[in-house]
Every structure is written in structure tokens, then in C-alpha cells.
Amino acid sequence: MLKEKMYDELILSTCRVLKLGPADFRVTDKNLFSKNPKFPLCDILLKLDFAYSLEYLLSLWEDLTKQEARFIFKNTGGAVSMSCYLHAPIKQESQNIVKECNILNVNECLSVCLNDIEAIKPSSSGVLTKCIIRRNRDAAFIVEFVAFGPESESEYIALLKAIILKKKFLERQDLEKHRAARHIKKPLRLQLKSVGEMTSFRSINYMGNTKDAAVFPVTVPIFARRNNILCGFLVAALLIVCYVIFKEFALSADFSAV
């Protein structure tokens, strides 16, 4: 007997995987299903030209219930419905052989389990089969199973290796970017230490003083060019001071001669 928690989990998983809205499915009542588990757990109205993850849902059901789940497609005349069973019902309306393209006329059914899907897959690993409903003619539909993925095991392994190498390359690039960012954000002392230069405060201060002394001859002409009036006043004052000093020396020389 299916537990209530498992019942709810199957319904929620089905809606999530197939991306169903409230109007897209009908659920069998819990009490009715517990009395007769041969009823379908839910009936789903499938849309045209929409890719449903059928293989993933079948494998999920089997993993949760440990039973061979079976989905039955039926042409109701105006659309295709899918009834989801925990296991094969006692009476199956038809015994169709599952192919990649299956034509369903009115009231015809197609029973599908996980083994049927795996039988038509081009490779057993790395391929997920999806189901697409298409209109064939007036009242007939096509149930098409499309495999997405490499067509051979060697292609699948090569694809995995390429993905892993690409992932490692991107991770190495990110690591180098983080290292460069941390180096830029380091204080001056740590930056100098990381590149093997002077690390003491005295050596850093000496380096700053040497830099200032080297720049001083260059900064004087720049200061004079930007402050013409002030420089002219200073030159005039300097000339006046020199004239006064020269005059004092001349007077003292005259007195000594007398």
C-alpha cells in the first residue's frame, strides 16, 4: 500500500518535472487509490509540441516506489492524455511496440515503461529521452520519443572529459584573478615583502626621502612658472637686501679710510 507521504511526493514530483499547471492534470483520490491501487495515480492532459522529460520521470517513480512504473498514452479524440500507474494495470487495451514515432488514432493506447525507453535509446549513458506530442492528421496524433545526448558511449566519455577540462581551466582562471586582487589590496609593506624588496620602516622612509630629493630640482621651476607675481616680489626683495648690505660695506670702508 502506498503511504500518504509517498503519494504526495509522487504528485509534487510529477508536476515539477513535467511543469504542469492546476488545469493540466487530475489526481485520483487518496482513499480510492488506497482501496484499489490498480487505478492510475493521476491523468495528465498533454500539450502539443512540448518536450516532456518522460525518462527522468519514469526513473524517479521507480526509484521512489521500487516498482515498475508504467505510463499509458491515449488518444481521446481531441487530445492525448497520459495515465500514470505505479505498475502495469491488469487489463491493457493494447500491446503496442514502443518506437521512436508512434501513431495513435482515436481511442488507441500506447503503454510505456522505463525498459521500453532504454530499448530505443542510441546509448545507455548520458542520454535522456523526452516525449513530444504532435498532430498527424485530423484525429490522429504522433507520440514521439526524442533522445537528447551523444549517440555513442565514446562520444559521451569524450564530452565528459571536455567538460571537466573546461571546468578546471575556468577554476584556475578564477584563482589567478583572486590572487591578483588580493595583491593589489595589500598594504605597502606587505606588497614590498611579497616582491622581495625593502620591508623595514627605515628603508621605506629612506626610499621616500630619496624620491623627494630627486624630484626637488624639477619642482622648483614648476613652482616658479605657476606663481609669477610671488617670485617677482621675492626677487625684488632679495635685490633690496643685497643693495642695503652692499651700501653698509661701502660706508664702513669709507670710515676706515678716513
From Swiss-Prot:
Keywords: Host membrane, Host nucleus, Late protein, Membrane, Phosphoprotein, Transmembrane, Transmembrane helix
Presence of keyword Hydrolase: no
InterPro entries: Herpesvirus_viron_egress-type
Top-level taxonomic group: Viruses
Assembly and binders: Forms a heterohexameric complex with NEC1.
Organism encoding this protein: Human herpesvirus 7 (strain JI)
Family affiliation: Belongs to the herpesviridae NEC2 protein family.
Residue ranges of the TM segments: 229-249
Role of this protein: Plays an essential role in virion nuclear egress, the first step of virion release from infected cell. Within the host nucleus, NEC1 interacts with the newly formed capsid through the vertexes and directs it to the inner nuclear membrane by associating with NEC2. Induces the budding of the capsid at the inner nuclear membrane as well as its envelopment into the perinuclear space.
GO CC, one annotated term: host cell nuclear inner membrane
Name recorded for this polypeptide: Nuclear egress protein 2
Stretches assigned to the Perinuclear space side: 1-228
Primary location class: host cell
HAMAP family the UniProt entry points to: HSV_NEC2
Topology versus the membrane: Single-pass membrane protein
